[in-house]
């Protein structure tokens, strides 16, 4: 939402037109909405902007605390808000999906799977990316844990020890495995 800030509906419509003219499609609105953080920006302008863009999916973040720091009240708050925004998005024919990321409730395979399981009755999905510094087997386990909730894959390659970003080709062997696992998941992503 840096390029098309929430609430800037006219700009979103223009970007949608420009995107279609270029022969492209909007795959997602990459918002920075923090689920469960009521004191922050509201979801409704995010939803309106995604609609104007023609984005079928809105990326959201599972709170502001990592799973190790989150207490039960935090988890309940995130789950309740996720249900609320998923319902709003569904009314508009859209879907929300969590960023799979550090310092949120999707920062471990187990926590991400637990959150998605708690939201089983909703259409909430998940992005997936290989966690920085994690071994390939752990990354694959996370991708499998997301399973049929997979919406999109973020492709990056990081040096496991230094955590420096590398050319994607440097991770080719791992990415062949990740993409094969993603391809085995039903649906488009």
Residue positions per predicted region:
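N-terminal pre-domain/capping segments
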Residues: 1-57, 83, 90, 121, ...
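A short acidic, helix-capping loop that chelates divalent metal ions and anchors anionic groups
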Residues: 1-3, 35, 64-71, 135-137, ...
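Acidic/histidine-rich catalytic cores of soluble enzymes
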Residues: 29, 84-175
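A general structural detector for well-ordered alpha-helical segments in enzyme core domains, enriched
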Residues: 11-18, 42-49, 74, 78-85, ...
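Short, intrinsically disordered, charge-balanced linker/junction segments flanking boundaries
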Residues: 1-3, 173-189
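Flexible, glycine- and charge-enriched loops at secondary-structure boundaries
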Residues: 5-12, 40-43, 68-78, 105, ...
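Active-site groove signature of glycoside hydrolases
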Residues: 50-71, 92-102
């Amino acid at each position: 939402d840096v390029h098309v800030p929430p609430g800037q509906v006219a700009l979103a419509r223009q970007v949608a037109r420009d995107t279609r003219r270029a022969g492209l499609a909007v795959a997602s609105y990459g918002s920075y909405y923090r689920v469960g953080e009521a004191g922050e920006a509201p979801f409704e302008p995010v939803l309106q902007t995604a609609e104007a863009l023609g984005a079928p999916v809105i990326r959201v973040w599972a709170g502001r605390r990592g799973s190790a720091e989150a207490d039960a009240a935090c988890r309940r708050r995130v789950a309740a808000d996720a249900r609320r925004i998923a319902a709003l998005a569904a009314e508009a024919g859209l879907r929300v999906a969590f960023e799979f990321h550090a310092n949120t409730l999707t920062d471990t395979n187990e926590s991400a799977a637990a959150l998605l399981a708690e939201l089983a009755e909703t259409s909430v999905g998940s992005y997936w990316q290989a966690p920085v510094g994690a071994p390939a087997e752990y990354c694959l386990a996370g991708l499998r844990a997301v399973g049929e909730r997979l919406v999109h894959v973020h492709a990056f390659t990081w040096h496991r020890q230094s955590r420096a970003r590398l050319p994607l080709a440097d991770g080719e062997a791992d990415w062949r495995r990740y993409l094969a696992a993603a391809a085995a998941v039903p649906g488009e992503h």
